[in-house]
Amino acid sequence: MSETITLMKSHTSVRRFKEEAIPQEDLNTILSAGQMASSWKNFQSYSVIVVRSQEKKDALYELVPQEAIRQSAAFLLFVGDLNRAEKGARLHTDTFQPQGVEGLLITSVDAALAGQNTLLAAESLGYGGVIIGLVRYKSVELAELFKLPDYTYPVFGIALGVPNQNHDVKPRLPLENVVFEEEYQEQTTEAIEAYDRVQTEYAGARATTTWSQRLAEQFGQPEPSSTRENLEQKNLL
């Protein structure tokens, strides 16, 4: 097995960090590697805001109370960004249409691909991190905190630092439950219940809910109002 695949298959989320900074050279290497991810038509429809000041991290923590944010050496906010596209398009046309859902998919996928590249690059240098999607639940407040202009929105953040904890690799769904030959295969309740048992065994005494219970918590409630409100304010919907 190649070193790259070994690294990818050993990924764990790291939420506790040592009080050590990430040298600028390492951070530049990590971010430039993230930039090399594939993107739709090479539009690169995302931006990254690097947060290193403790004051700013504390302010973000007040909105999104995840301890990893405060402890991180650097918090990277990945922003879906059509602001740059709007400026580029207006060099050639008087109209700019962000394309609603399609525009959101373009920017979200571009940001996600760059984010995964970024985290993998960080792990290759011995750092750890965790992706924090809860930033979307406070989209309006984050837009103000980070001065996000029209046609931009927070997609997720990555808390990075020198790991101060180690976890076993969390078991994923069996390959046959997510990879199908030629056509989609309907999910079965039995497969979900089997994975519930795998996850519960992995978590041991730390388990408070099953995997399917967390699905119910997420998708048994309406969408976060702040997400849509911010998208509308930024002229993306």
Predicted regions and their residues:
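Acidic, surface-exposed loops and disordered segments
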Residues: 1-237
